[in-house]
Amino acid sequence: MAKVIGIDLGTTNSCLAISENGQTKVIENAEGARTTPSVIAYLDGGEILVGAPAKRQAVTNAKNTIYAAKRLIGHKFEDKEVQRDIESMPFEIIKANNGDAWVKAQGKELSPPQISAEVLRKMKEAAEAYLGEKVTEAVITVPAYFNDSQRQATKDAGRIAGLDVKRIINEPTAAALAFGMDKGDNKDRKVAVYDLGGGTFDISIIEIANLDGDKQFEVLATNGDTFLGGEDFDQRLIDYIIDEFKKEQGIDLKQDVMALQRLKEAAEKAKIELSSGQQTEINLPYITMDATGPKHLAMKITRAKFESLVEDLIARSIEPCRTALKDAGLSTGDIDDVILVGGQSRMPKVQEAVRDFFGKEPRKDVNPDEAVAVGAAIQGEVLSGGRSDVLLLDVTPLSLGIETMGGVMTKLIQKNTTIPTKASQVFSTAEDNQSAVTIHVLQGERERASANKSLGQFNLGDIAPAPRGMPQIEVTFDIDANGILHVSAKDKGTGKAANITIQGSSGLSEEEIERMVKDAEANAEEDKKLTELVASRNQAEALIHSVKKSLADYGDKLDAAEKEKIEAALKEAEEAVKGDDKTAIDAKAEALGTASQKLGEMVYAQAQAEAQAGEGAQAESSAKKDDDIVDADFEEVKDDKK
């Protein structure tokens, strides 16, 4: 059976794990790290960097280095959250033809799924390197509070990366899975998973039950905020530094993308340091300059100051906890364990707020960076048939329904309904002799249709003429295990039906996905060629260096014609490595190797002679030492003190 890998596709960092024979392992990336920054850089010449290499060059390539693309996934350009991010991001966010928020880098228009696919591809390659076989299937996690458009867009990202996404599961559910399977006991427990990541916040109340040796994970309720996370905490600190610097120097750093990128790195580092220390210093020399010369930024930030800057963000995470508990029909006293997930949950003030709300100390034995990927890998092993001792019952985070007369939303599936699920309801026409109806699918909790998220619409035509209210139109909502919605409508009088899988009024079309898959495959081929070119160039340069050194040491022992031949081959090889033609580099390196063969023989002969001379000298020295040995008389001394 093919291996199904588990991927936590995070806003700030991503993580990869695999589960085999009941054992789960987090897999290191090409740089040897267990997590990969979700940062993608587009360079001149078409090269794409992902992860730490992309992050390292961000300051000098701010406009073409994309981070936190997950915050844009499945979003319209006009969404207020996107508009808020436009002001703080150094790269350009644009409006796509379908109204979605896309990104522009190196003159190319890129969709968020396309950008996220680069991270997924890096994960896929790391898994293949570890397993030594091709990987095509994955379980990918998403925030529990992701709507249908965002889930669909995440699946699209997987396809573009060459992965068949077997299941989309919610991040808190995955973390609970990792926690529950790690516990050897058979105790039933109710857990609250507080997941404050880089860009999103989720809270899920999950019941872990032991059923004859198998474990059932049932999500009782979930809530959250898809625009609340570590990036927002960083931004508060960045805004504060910018304001203070403006007061002191009269210069607005918001206008300088390079300064913004340096500030982002410094703020992230300061935030991490303040989780263990009471104070940190931000030092950014030459941050900018004006007519009077260069300006330096030096500022002390205390933990108390930082906490005051983000106080309301922490408070914002507590309200969804209250709602989730209420929806689950539980009180804080019913919760056995509180699990913290996501890097931002390491902040002491966040932990204090969680402890105060739930009335108990959150558990510290769950790795907040890796638990989600581990849970995804466990679910991957279940789906591949590798284990059957786990049953996962997840829920839909938001209510689903259609727009009905008067612009109201009529709900067919309530939030926190266990999935997969199906629901049907009969509707009718609003006018006499109406020949068609438009089914407008919505997701959200508001009564007014326009206040909810529009997922898409479709028409059911050829309705037989009849007075209003007479035709019977049955609308069926069907949510699969990924939380993705399929909607159908049927005229019960004529039997005519229409249906769609919701891809949202936004989202990528099938043609766009196919094109992006082809682009990605072409890119993979380009990457392979680049790797081969670099390897050839490195080998050639090593040979050039070696020949030059040997020529300097032994060149005077060669006849003039031989030396000239080597120097000519050297020059040609040096010219070749400056170019990008792998064939030419290989050919010139081979020619240099042939031309310098005699020189190589000379170096080898000299080395042999030196080695033999060394051995002779050592033998002589050893013999001399033997001659110097003096026989000595000795007598045994008895120790009377014993």
Swiss-Prot record:
<dbReference type="GO" id="GO:0051082">
    <property type="term" value="F:unfolded protein binding"/>
</dbReference>
<feature type="compositionally biased region" description="Low complexity">
    <location>
        <begin position="608"/>
        <end position="621"/>
    </location>
</feature>
<dbReference type="InterPro" id="IPR012725">
    <property type="entry name" value="Chaperone_DnaK"/>
</dbReference>
<dbReference type="InterPro" id="IPR013126">
    <property type="entry name" value="Hsp_70_fam"/>
</dbReference>
<comment type="similarity">
    <text>Belongs to the heat shock protein 70 family.</text>
</comment>
<dbReference type="InterPro" id="IPR029047">
    <property type="entry name" value="HSP70_peptide-bd_sf"/>
</dbReference>
<dbReference type="InterPro" id="IPR043129">
    <property type="entry name" value="ATPase_NBD"/>
</dbReference>
<protein>
    <recommendedName>
        <fullName>Chaperone protein DnaK</fullName>
    </recommendedName>
</protein>
<dbReference type="Pfam" id="PF00012">
    <property type="entry name" value="HSP70"/>
</dbReference>
<keyword id="KW-0346">Stress response</keyword>
<feature type="modified residue" description="Phosphothreonine; by autocatalysis">
    <location>
        <position position="200"/>
    </location>
</feature>
<keyword id="KW-0597">Phosphoprotein</keyword>
<feature type="region of interest" description="Disordered">
    <location>
        <begin position="608"/>
        <end position="642"/>
    </location>
</feature>
<dbReference type="GO" id="GO:0005524">
    <property type="term" value="F:ATP binding"/>
</dbReference>
<keyword id="KW-0143">Chaperone</keyword>
<comment type="function">
    <text>Acts as a chaperone.</text>
</comment>
<dbReference type="InterPro" id="IPR018181">
    <property type="entry name" value="Heat_shock_70_CS"/>
</dbReference>
<dbReference type="GO" id="GO:0140662">
    <property type="term" value="F:ATP-dependent protein folding chaperone"/>
</dbReference>
<dbReference type="InterPro" id="IPR029048">
    <property type="entry name" value="HSP70_C_sf"/>
</dbReference>
<keyword id="KW-0547">Nucleotide-binding</keyword>
<keyword id="KW-0067">ATP-binding</keyword>
<feature type="compositionally biased region" description="Acidic residues">
    <location>
        <begin position="628"/>
        <end position="642"/>
    </location>
</feature>
